[in-house]
């Protein structure tokens, strides 16, 4: 098996280095990751400046672009040979609920899906036990049936920040919800000009049983299938009925 590994924290991040080391025990691994932290880049692509992949001494690649750039460029540009799976992570911090909208970690996996490959995104609910998350991924990959690694979807994994032996197991979950966050931090820079920082994420609003928030909070690894189709199917019929009523009067 040949695995392409990327992330949004940058090639230097501890999470991706631990993940690549562990994955190399079960597969051939190619790392192509951003040259700096690109957290919350979502699925943005760089269209207004050239991308420059740099081949590092250890064989990895870093790119002056987003997570989606890295996967797109690797698979369509400079990598030769077949890739069987895309794995993105290990993110420093969870990607649950509404986090998935902004996440560059998920975006790298979704780009692999868009290019026809099965893909996994993995995040740690903290910054300590990266080895735990890496072991979880290596444990799951051989066990996931081929049909579960559907190129039309990705698997989103969130791991409690615990020693591996303290994990309670795995739970398949739906996404929860966070409360709306409107915090912006206003400061002055050294030139006395006003600057702003986007504030931290809000607390979970829906962390009921069955959600990813609930699973991780209670010591379980959450596993959530994610699709790129954003159609609100439950609203199609009512919207169609409204349209017919409004325009057939």
UniProtKB/Swiss-Prot annotation:
Residues that coordinate or bind a divalent metal cation: 8-9, 39, 91
Documented EC number(s): 3.1.3.5
Broadest EC class assigned to this enzyme: hydrolase
Cofactor(s) annotated in UniProt: a divalent metal cation
Keyword Ribonucleoprotein in annotation: no
Recorded catalytic activity of this chain's protein: a ribonucleoside 5'-phosphate + H2O = a ribonucleoside + phosphate
Cystine connections: none
UniProt keyword Ribosomal protein, yes or no: no
Single GO cellular component term: cytoplasm
GO MF term (any one): 3'-nucleotidase activity
Free-text cofactor note: Binds 1 divalent metal cation per subunit.
Record keywords: Cytoplasm, Hydrolase, Metal-binding, Nucleotide-binding
Localization: Cytoplasm
PANTHER family: 5'-NUCLEOTIDASE SURE, 5'_3'-NUCLEOTIDASE SURE
Functional description taken from the UniProt entry: Nucleotidase that shows phosphatase activity on nucleoside 5'-monophosphates.
Family membership: Belongs to the SurE nucleotidase family.
Record-given protein name: 5'-nucleotidase SurE
Source species of the chain: Haemophilus influenzae (strain PittGG)
Taxonomic classification: Bacteria, Pseudomonadati, Pseudomonadota, Gammaproteobacteria, Pasteurellales
């Amino acid at each position: 098996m040949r695995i392409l590994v990327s992330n949004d924290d940058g090639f230097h991040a501890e999470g991706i280095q631990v993940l690549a080391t562990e994955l190399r025990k079960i597969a051939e691994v190619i790392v192509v990751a951003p040259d700096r932290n690109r957290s919350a880049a979502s699925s943005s692509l760089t269209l207004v400046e050239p991308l420059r992949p740099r081949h590092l001494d250890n064989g990895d690649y870093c790119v002056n672009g987003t997570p989606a750039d890295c996967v797109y460029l690797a698979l369509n540009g400079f990598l030769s040979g077949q890739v069987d799976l895309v794995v993105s992570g290990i993110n420093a911090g969870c990607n649950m609920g509404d986090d998935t909208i902004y996440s560059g970690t998920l975006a790298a996996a979704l780009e692999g899906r868009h290019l026809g490959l099965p893909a996994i995104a993995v995040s740690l609910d903290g910054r300590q036990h990266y080895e735990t998350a890496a072991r979880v991924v290596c444990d799951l990959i051989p066990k996931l049936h081929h049909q579960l690694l559907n190129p039309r979807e990705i698997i989103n994994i969130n791991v409690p920040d615990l020693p591996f032996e303290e994990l309670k197991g795995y739970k398949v979950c739906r996404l929860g919800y966070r409360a709306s966050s409107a915090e912006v931090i206003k400061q002055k820079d050294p030139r006395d000009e006003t600057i702003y920082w986007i504030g931290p994420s809000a607390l979970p609003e829906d962390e009921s049983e069955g959600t990813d928030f609930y699973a991780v909070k209670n010591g379980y690894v959450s596993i959530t299938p994610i699709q790129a189709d954003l159609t609100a199917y439950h609203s199609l019929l009512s919207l169609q009925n409204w349209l017919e009523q409004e325009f057939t009067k």
